Structure formats: C-alpha cells, structure tokens
Amino acid sequence: MEPRRHSRERKEQYCMCGIIGYAGHRPAVPVIIEGLRRLEYRGYDSAGVGFIQGRELKVIKAEGKLAALEEKLAHYPNTVAMNGIGHTRWATHGVPAERNAHPHIGGNNELAIIHNGIIENFQELKEGLLAKGYVFKSETD
C-alpha cells in the first residue's frame, strides 16, 4: 500500500508518520525517543509514547514537535520499561491536537496501538462501535 501524498509538502513526495517500537534489555523510552528524533521529519504535529511501568500502561502524548513530548517525559525520570512504542504524527485526518496523537488506548487501558494511514470505511466501523456503546476519545481512534 502506498502512503498518501500530503498537501503541505513542497515537493511531490510521499508522507507517512514515524513509527517505532523497541523490546530489549535497555530502558525503552530513551531508545524510542532517539528513534523518534530520526523520524521527526515524518511528522511534527504531535508525538507520543506508550510503555509498561510496573504493571501499568503509561501513554504520554504532546501536541507539536518532539521537544514538547520530551518535556512531558522529564516528569518520568525513573522509567525502566524495557519495551514500548512511539509515534510522530503528520495530521492527515483530525486536527493536530494532543487528543488525536498516538498511541491510542483501548481495552480498559490495557492496550496501546499506533497505526499509519486512514481506514477507508472508518465511518461505518465507528457507527457500529457507537451502537455497541464504545466511547471514542479522539477524531483518530
């Protein structure tokens, strides 16, 4: 599947968000942030990370450039998670806002997910989930 062209680009290039995951023997958040630095050109509307701290899922998001996320992560200096995911977003659906940043949380805060692209039949899927009582938290989850 080809990534979509983004209208804000000056050149005729394809645009995708930046996605990274890490599972290893080192603390994950610094590895993920370094990866997001390398991918920031793929999206600077928002950024976010998800990781397990102890037995709790932590998702930290920020609108704007990666530096805004790094400021928020400074409040978590003792993060020792050995796995996690990260995302830089170029808004193609939904406004640039923290609520629309990835990772998205589901499953009673037991699942964090990141994706790239637009699900073409999202409206049909959303209506079905709303009918079942699901509460959406953003324009992009």
Task: Explain the meaning of each model-derived region.
Residues 2-4, 10-141:
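Conserved short alpha-helical segments that host acidic/polar catalytic motifs at enzyme active sites
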